[in-house]
Amino acid sequence: MSETRPDCDEVVLLGRSNVGKSTLMRELTGHTGFTTGRKPGVTRSPNHYDWASESFMFTDLPGFGFMSGVESSQREQIKTDIVRYIESNAESILAAVLVVDGKSAVEIIDRHSGPDEIPHDIELFSFLWELDLPTVVAVNKIDKVENKDNQLDDLCDRLGLYPPWQQWQDTIAPISAKRGSIEPLEEALQAIFSDQRRDDLLKFVT
């Protein structure tokens, strides 16, 4: 998955198919060439957008979970490839952005929770924290959510973060990529870059 990866620091975007990662990528980079669509799983390989002179890039990783017309074994392989990509490049990953659909994330997590099953979102969130990677959960499509505070509190609870969500604004970023409203995510990334003494990268998230 990383054969054509530019050799530079990066912020990775990951999440289920059809949560708006590619739309968010367009908002973050100002580049319109990323593939988006209604059909889940449009992105099947990493999309890199790099600034060669700055040695920095955003990477949109393939969507995981359900994809129309894709066998279960292939879906699992995609998730495995994502994990391997992150493990292989962890030293260059400045931050990970786990994108979820604000309207359906809690319901999907609950549906796939059980004695023998860990929801992919929870599994990957825990994986990122175990790697000690700065992680932001971008709760996308928040404009479609009623009772936003309750939904965000419930999401925090599922992620193992004690509500209320407002105390986790460095980790929980409610956004609407389609409407261009991504300031909470930009502010969270600004804080991460500042902590890493990478003020040279602040211009990419303002």
Curated annotation (Swiss-Prot):
Domain of life, source organism: Archaea
Signal peptide residues on this chain, from the entry's feature table: none
Binding-site positions, GTP: 15-22, 41-45, 60-63, 140-143, 175-177
Domain EngB-type G: 7-195
One Pfam match: MMR_HSR1
Annotated binding of Mg(2+), by residue: 22, 43
Keyword flag Cytoplasm: no
Gene Ontology process terms (BP): cell division
Keywords linked to the UniProt accession: Cell cycle, Cell division, GTP-binding, Magnesium, Metal-binding, Nucleotide-binding, Septation
Single GO MF descriptor: GTP binding
NCBIfam families: PRK04213.1
Role according to the record: Necessary for normal cell division and for the maintenance of normal septation.
Protein name, per record: Probable GTP-binding protein EngB
